[in-house]
Amino acid sequence: FSIIVFFPTFKKDFGFFDEDLPACEDYDYWLRYSAKEDVIFIDEPLIIKKGGHSDQLSGVHWGMDRFRIRSLEKLLNEPGIKLVHKNDAIREVILKLAILINGSQKRKKFAYADSMLQKKQYWENILMRDEDD
């Protein structure tokens, strides 16, 4: 399990986890946080990550990147997002959509793959437009 201790100002500034997301709530939260605050990366492992437990949500929901894409798109609709953060988020959406498209095609979910391909092309066009400006 994961534990996070919040300062009282966190709720006012960033809210809490998005409970409408069936999974990836922590991903969504830290996206919102890191879009507004500087994050320092420590180049030393401080945790031991273990996966594959039967009670993990990744075993319950297929295509976990669907929820990450949703979080990224939600971030992209936030007012005042800096262009550098916006373009980084768009690149990540494109990457996650490519993974989702590949997995959908592998599982013969062609209609879903096509709809994700259209979404990917939309974001690629937005990114090209922003980079041309």
What are these regions (language model features)?
Residues K86-A89, V93, A113:
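Residues that mark the junctions of alpha-helical repeat units in TPR/alpha-solenoid scaffolds
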